[in-house]
Regions:
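Anion-binding alpha/beta catalytic cores of soluble intermediary-metabolism enzymes, centered on
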Residues: 2-185, 189-196, 200-210
Length: 210
């Protein structure tokens, strides 16, 4: 609509050498155009504006013209800068996979570790988030955590620390870990909080509104 067109024109006028505006007749067309620009190497980052997420994902996941290689997993990661925490805090997956399988969880973890390392964290500290702090068959998600911990200990994910299950406070507050008697390189120093989308979405939104 007109206000957003005016905003795009304002940005173009401010940075004429760096910004090119493409017209699209619908949200789907806008998403398709953006995906095409990335595929063709004319853009490095795809950003979502006022269009709905489903419009964007239809274009990204299109088997013929999308961005996701066949057989790969699409996931989501949030990076937050929190005044009361001494470093960036990463959350995954808060949007795409509500209840990942073990294979999907491992793929997500590898993506997340790559993002952390590219942002300068050579040994990411990963907290596996859950309401309980013990592996318990009543909580199937924690059984996957046990597998991931074993693989991490064997060096499958390179130089990093991974521990859990634990709650967010324990992951980010060393005193909380001391009170609970939990000793781990991750406790109080987590770089990445990972869980299913339901848990991470709640925590991520809570942080953004704190």
């Amino acid at each position: 609509d007109t206000p957003h067109l005016l905003n795009a024109e304002y940005i173009r006028l401010q940075y004429p050498e760096h910004v090119k505006v493409y017209e699209a007749t619908s949200p789907d067309k806008a998403a398709q155009e953006g995906v095409a620009l990335v595929r063709e190497g004319h853009a490095d980052v795809l950003m979502k504006g006022i269009i709905n997420t489903d419009n964007l994902l239809r274009a990204v996941l299109n088997k013929e013209h999308g961005l996701l290689p066949q057989g790969n997993v699409l996931s989501h990661i949030t990076v937050a800068q929190i005044p009361t925490y001494n470093k960036l805090l990463f959350f995954s997956d808060a949007a795409v996979i509500p209840r990942p399988t073990l294979a999907q969880f491992e793929a997500m973890l590898k993506y997340d570790l790559e993002v952390c390392r590219r942002l300068g964290i050579s040994e990411p500290r990963v907290a596996l988030i859950h309401c309980t702090e013990k592996i318990n068959e009543k909580f199937p998600h924690t059984l996957d955590y046990a597998v991931l911990k074993e693989r991490a200990a064997s060096g499958a994910y390179g130089s990093m620390f991974l521990d859990g299950p634990m709650d967010v406070k324990t992951a980010c507050d060393a005193h909380s870990g001391e009170v609970k008697g939990i000793s781990s390189p991750v406790v109080g120093h987590a770089d990445l909080l990972t869980a299913n989308a339901v848990a991470i979405t709640c925590n991520g939104r809570g942080v953004r509104h704190t």
